[in-house]
Amino acid sequence: MSKKRLHEIAKEIGKSSKEVVEHAKYLGLDVKSHASSVEEADAKKIISSFSKASKPDVTASQAVKPKEVAQPSVTVVKETGSEHVEKTQVSKPKSRNFKAEREARAKEQAARKQANGSSHRSQERRGGYRQPNNHQTNEQGDKRITHRSQGDTNDKRIERKASNVSPRHDNHQLVGDRNRSFAKENHKNGRFTNQKKQGRQEPQSKSPKIDFKARAAALKAEQNAEYSRQSETRFRAQQEAKRLAELARQEAKEAALKAQAEEMSHREAALKSIEEAETKLKSSNISAKSTADNRRKKQARPEKNRELTHHSQEGQKKNKKSWNSQNQVRNQKNSNWNKNKKTKKGKNVKNTNTAPKPVTERKFHELPKEFEYTEGMTVAEIAKRIKREPAEIVKKLFMMGVMATQNQSLDGDTIELLMVDYGIEAKAKVEVDDADIERFFEDENYLNPENIVERAPVVTIMGHVDHGKTTLLDTLRNSRVATGEAGGITQHIGAYQIEEAGKKITFLDTPGHAAFTSMRARGASVTDITILIVAADDGVMPQTIEAINHSKAAGVPIIVAINKIDKPGANPERVIAELAEYGIISTAWGGECEFVEISAKFNKNIDELLETVLLVAEVEELKADPTVRAIGTVIEARLDKGKGAIATLLVQQGTLHVQDPIVVGNTFGRVRAMVNDLGRRVKSAEPSTPVSITGLNETPMAGDHFAVYADEKAARAAGEERSKRALLKQRQNTQRVSLDNLFDTLKAGEIKTVNVIIKADVQGSVEALAASLVKIEVEGVRVNVVHSAVGAINESDVTLAEASNAVIIGFNVRPTPQARQQADTDDVEIRLHSIIYKVIEEVEEAMKGKLDPVYQEKVLGEAIIRETFKVSKVGTIGGFMVINGKVTRDSSVRVIRDSVVIFDGKLASLKHYKDDVKEVGNAQEGGLMIENFNDLKVDDTIEAYIMEEIVRK
């Protein structure tokens, strides 16, 4: 039996769902909400209950019922006695219906207008109330008046809730005119048991009273019914609109499908005509027929599979006895989906049956006359370059006997043979190593002869220590550089530029100490002219000879400046004669070298020296092209804590600009800032100009070449490639153990090493220190430089020193506070210096202390045993007398008997009489005991000696 939901019943009878739920509960049905379901019989019972519209008791007053509206339930309570008062309870509406209230008030006003003389009769009624007839009437009248006042109060409260109007105005309407209009009806229905006695002379008659609550409830129910009918009408209109919209949508969809089908038919017809045209042009019908057969077979296979699937499903259905309804629904959905899928497949199959689109012919391209190839090009790359199909090239290679695919690399010979077959001239591409900076210094063909201009000469000042090199530069620059140098010697290269007679001269100041040989050689390699300073009082010194050799090796002209001619012992002629022995011959003697006698301290003949420099530069014809990208050499490099790597560069060709991508040695970067020799920021540097730059990712080596690249990407690639090559070269230089050097390697393991970590302010000082320390010769000990770098001593250096048991040497640098604290904690030694030869001396002493000490025996004295005493639990005590030297408590002794040493050991005790003493002198007597020896005899000789350490020289 089917079921109905309560909200469906409410919709059917035009009632609210809440009323239907209440009626169902009243009838004893187990329902919870409007969504609850009831049986068909229960539904009919609910509908019939609404149609009957159950009435109250006969004795109770009833309200007027509108058509098809259920009367609200009214409960009447009667009181017996003289008062005869009735109490009426009316179910309150759930919500106020203002429209119903307005209609009720309109009806009341219309009834009031129809009444004649309402105001006059009401006045008489008021006067009648004031005239009581007798005691009984007054008593009953008082009671009725009291009851009426209570009724009026209740009526007023009901009217305030219903109409939200003035209670005073409502009182007149309800009590006056409405009572007269509905007097007969109220009396007939018996709503009111109390009669209004005011203004009447019949105190015992009972006039009916209007039940306004019931009236309002009836109006409310009528309005609800009207609203339900309107809602149902709107709902049916909406449903009809939806149905019409759905029909319109389906019609539009069918029209679109029809148009699409027509378009597909036109397309199929066009494709069919194209296929017929192509079949006429094809010479071979066999291939077309086989293709069609294959397509028909492919179409037949799915049908066969579907038939097999259908039969298998029927068999399964026969075997299965019962099917679940839910499974049937799901299978039905799947079957519909498969049906749609088959339809789509059918469309695709239909499209596959149509002829394929004609292949557009490739546009013809002329073959190039020349083809530049590289080793290892693939077939696809060659085809793209000559604008041919890869399959065509593969075919040609196959005819040539070469099996290749389009992604296979070909060698140069195969590519040349292939190009000959095509009639193209093949040329191998000359690959340029972008990471090779040295090619710019070896080949100058990239320079433009039209842009070559004269450049400033680069002059290097060389000479022995304290011969006046820095003093000369100080005089030239009018600055005090020499006073800032530690120990009066120059520690690293300084590059400066001065102007003389409108022309610029760049000076490089090189150190004169023996440790800076590599720096002097580097200075000579970048210079144009060398000024060799020789002190007139000292003459030629070892570093002077070294500077001469460097200049000759670099092939640069030499100008000799004989300095300190103001000193009393100056002898310039001796200097000229000594230099002649090394091939430096003055022009006065018929040579090619210019000699100038100067006094750098007193600024004597300085102008003459500068004029000589400009004259030699003019003879050398120094030229440069400032328009090309800059190249040059690193003069010095250091690491700054705030700025990072700082490199002093000497521009040799081109112009260096800020933001230029640059490769310096094995590192790369971009020129972030540029500072000249005066400490001023500049935006560009022309040839022969020294500048300091920042922006490198690492600190380069002094003497490295640099070059500016077109973009940062190329500079990065070149820098990384150079760094990779340097690392590979370093690994190749690692010594491998072989049978030939196995003995030397094992022997080297016996040599003690002093591990050092070098940190300096500039790269040149690092190189000089490392080279000098390695050259220290102490037999059995060598220096091992664990790490060397520029910059302050940091925590990582201390950690490395602790791990390798090394000493940290700081040259013109200081440790950070954190590094100093860590060094104190880890007990790592840090030595700070500013003069190089003191570093060398200190390390040499440490190397000597590393060797095992060498001891030499020293005899202190001799003694003769005069008497022996044997003491139990102690041993033998020998009484002796010193015959030579002395015997000490901490000395070793030998027991000699018959000129044969029978024991060698330590003294256990030494006494003079009963006192323990440290030594017994010559011609004194005493007693002694020897450790682990009790075989002392009279006349044994006791020889006392010690081992002394020999100081190494």
From Swiss-Prot:
Primary residence: cytoplasm
Keyword GTP-binding set for record: yes
Region (G5): 599-601
CC per GO annotation: cytosol
Stretch list, region Disordered: 52-247, 279-363
Chain segments carrying region G4: 563-566
Keywords for this protein: Cytoplasm, GTP-binding, Initiation factor, Nucleotide-binding, Protein biosynthesis
Bias (Polar residues) ranges: 191-207, 282-291
InterPro entries: EF-G-like_DII (IPR053905), IF2_II (IPR044145), IF2_N (IPR006847), P-loop_NTPase (IPR027417), Small_GTP-bd (IPR005225), T_Tr_GTP-bd_dom (IPR000795), TF_IF2_bacterial-like (IPR000178), TIF_IF2 (IPR015760)
CDD domains registered for this protein in UniProt: IF2_eIF5B, IF2_mtIF2_II, mtIF2_IVc
Binding site for GTP: 463-470, 509-513, 563-566
Subcellular compartments: Cytoplasm
Signal peptide residue numbers: none
GO molecular function: GTP binding; GTPase activity; translation initiation factor activity
Domain tr-type G: 454-623
Biased composition (Basic residues): 339-348
A Pfam family the protein falls into: EF-G_D2
Stretches the record annotates as G2: 488-492
Amino acid composition bias (Basic and acidic residues), ranges on this chain: 80-89, 98-111, 140-188, 229-247, 300-317
Region ranges (G3): 509-512
Start and end residues of each stretch annotated as G1: 463-470
Highest taxon above the source species: Bacteria
Biased composition (Low complexity): 322-338
Role according to the record: One of the essential components for the initiation of protein synthesis. Protects formylmethionyl-tRNA from spontaneous hydrolysis and promotes its binding to the 30S ribosomal subunits. Also involved in the hydrolysis of GTP during the formation of the 70S ribosomal complex.
NCBIfam families according to UniProt: IF-2, small_GTP
Protein name (record): Translation initiation factor IF-2
Organism this protein belongs to: Streptococcus pyogenes serotype M5 (strain Manfredo)
